[in-house]
Amino acid sequence: MLVLGTYGAFKTKGENMRSSKKLLVVAFVAVGTLIGAACGGSDTTSDTTAAATDGCAAPEVNLDATGTETIKIARNNWSASAVEVEIVKQLIEKNLGNPVEIVDIDENAMFAGMSSGDIDASVEVWPSGVVPDEQAFIDDCSVSNMGALGAVGKIGWFVSDYALTQFPQLSSWEGLKDPEVAKAFATAATGDNGRFLGMDPSFSQYDEAIIANLALPFQVQFSGSEAATQAEVSALSAEEKPVLLYYWSPSGAVGKYNLKNIALPAPTVDCAAEGTACDGDYPEDPIFKIASTKLAAKDGKVFNFFQKFALTTDDQLSFLGPVDIDKVDPATAASDWIAANEATWSTWFN
């Protein structure tokens, strides 16, 4: 059964990190375009076979689909996903004719729903948030790895820029060991320990483990959501009160609030496999796409579109600023991106 909800009210990005479930970074295998598909209307077998990936047999694609099947795409609880699914919806509905339904769904349920065919695709999956139970659906070939999106993400620890002026020792992560620094970040709830502002507690995170294993005098407090974190940072910035927090790049908010990444030491363990022993920085995340393997038979043209769909980090930054800073509606930001990038997206329908 799918767990659905209202956008912004659910939890995503790697559930169960707090319960020490091991994370598994997906091995990327480049996904080719459909072999000879849509190049002249041929109905030969080679024209209807998608490129194989992840050790799975290439699915047979239905290029005779009439464009009437509803395509269901997963939307996750962060700004980039909100815009990307709108780009997908607008492009598919205009160019392929299929109605598109955006589904707000927990990532754990998303993989199961995609395996069953109830969800068709997700265009933003962070490798560090894929747990073994989710990877199993890719391994059994019921969920297809559709290749890299193109953007590269980086979760990390960020600090307000004025805090670096207030505490020059924060030029190195070791400055966080200073008890006087920690007190400056403290709240009534953390006592003498500094507050580390977490976000949604279900997001992929090692922060509690990093703090414990580096013996830092900090305590994690969760805001509950990206919006709540932005509101807290905005309030603290207005008074130039220091804040240390979990965030990621690319993000419009990082630029808006002049947040600076604190480079942590390289971990001595594989944090993806030994989360509670993690003692160092987060890895870079080459974001990738997934789709239900059943989508190939449901509508091969849409399946082909998802294989070709790609956005760079710069593409994301171009619409994250308006959405995060100017509060532009994601659908409007998507429409603006489409209007400015026809030379890019038109090739996805060749």
Model-derived features: where do they sit?
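C-terminal motif of bacterial Sec signal peptides marking the signal peptidase cleavage site
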Residues: 34-38
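Bacterial lipoprotein signal-peptidase II cleavage site
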Residues: 39-48
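Extracytoplasmic "Venus flytrap"
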Residues: 53-86, 107-108
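Short, well-ordered beta-strand elements
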Residues: 66-80, 98-103, 193-197, 306
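Pocket-flanking alpha-helical
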Residues: 85, 103-141, 232-234, 252-257
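Ligand-binding pocket segment of bilobal, Venus flytrap-like solute-binding proteins
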Residues: 113, 119-123, 194-271
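A conserved helix-loop-strand patch within extracytoplasmic ligand-binding domains
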Residues: 142-196
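A bilobed periplasmic-binding-protein/Venus flytrap-type ligand-binding module shared by bacterial periplasmic
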Residues: 155-165, 285-298, 321-322
